[in-house]
């Protein structure tokens, strides 16, 4: 009898331990790696710029990063919602990072969909340093960076994700 009770208690202890470890891992805020910060992007004018310099440009401001592409139907469906967020959050910098297949397609998509904000082209593509180190598995992808340069929302894949508005209101 006591062996059965001890076995049950041990199972409970192990289950609690697994839960604690899982929650502590998930609770850790993710930050951009050195590899991601050093990835080279292109400006609308075609100049090369490293990602850390882009973040430094907007330090002291809240940044909403939208990783998207003109060929991505979910990205395009989300644009009206992103535009609503822009209207509600005039003090937020909207940084659009494109994964279009070519610079020409990227430039066309900006004009076609009338996207206002700061635009950069991820020349290294989906498998480049930036995308691979942020665990990019779907676009659109939204990341929010606080005025101190820390990621406060690591992953949202819909512009109407309630966490986006909640985080923006809190900053």
Please identify what each model-predicted range represents.
Residues 31, 87-127, 136-139:
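Conserved segment of the thioredoxin-like fold in thiol-based oxidoreductases
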Residues 70, 102, 150:
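Conserved Rossmann-like nucleotide-cofactor binding loop
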Residues 115, 122-169:
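Thiol/disulfide oxidoreductase modules built on the thioredoxin-like
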